């Protein structure tokens, strides 16, 4: 028997859903199988195992006699481990429906496999992976609060100068990082003073992967277009 976190029999009141709902929510089938098998059975301290290992190791004598409690956080964690090891081509195919549902046009945009490789370490589900990838395929408008916090008269001329520098450098993560770091040193400001408004201009968010890696994948043309589009949002 599977119980909810409160010790009661698992039911719809606990958010119990069908197997297909877990698929639609972005869980990998092998992760769900791993989690369900581990609910009432164990093989030492092993938490992650393949289908083949499950077949090899499974023994009725190792089944717990006590009811198991369903733990969504544990399922998240197991799914995350599988996502980290999953093939990027497969993950790219899996997130396309989520991105299209969010109004993104993947064809002709940033290489989706490279985006997946960059982002998959920090997410728990395919749905979260797609959410994290949205800004690569359509610009996100920063909130007014973010504009007030990061778009100011002090940083505007610095970013205008950075746009000029970005026009002429080799478009690699290393070169982008070097230019941001050099610009910060030249203006005697800390790196976040430039990186944060730059991140907001380009992604519309403040929590992303390293900004140099994001810009490299986004590409020079799209990066500069987004930066230029937000210069008018800075106070004079």
PLM ranges: what are they?
Residues 88-189:
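Small-residue-rich helix-loop
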Residues 43-46, 67, 107-111, 190, ...:
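Short, surface-exposed helix-loop/turn micro-motifs enriched in polar/charged residues
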Residues 29, 51, 92, 112-116, ...:
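Short runs of predominantly hydrophobic/aromatic residues within well-ordered alpha helices
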Residues 23, 37, 56, 100, ...:
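Short polybasic/polar patches that bind polyanions
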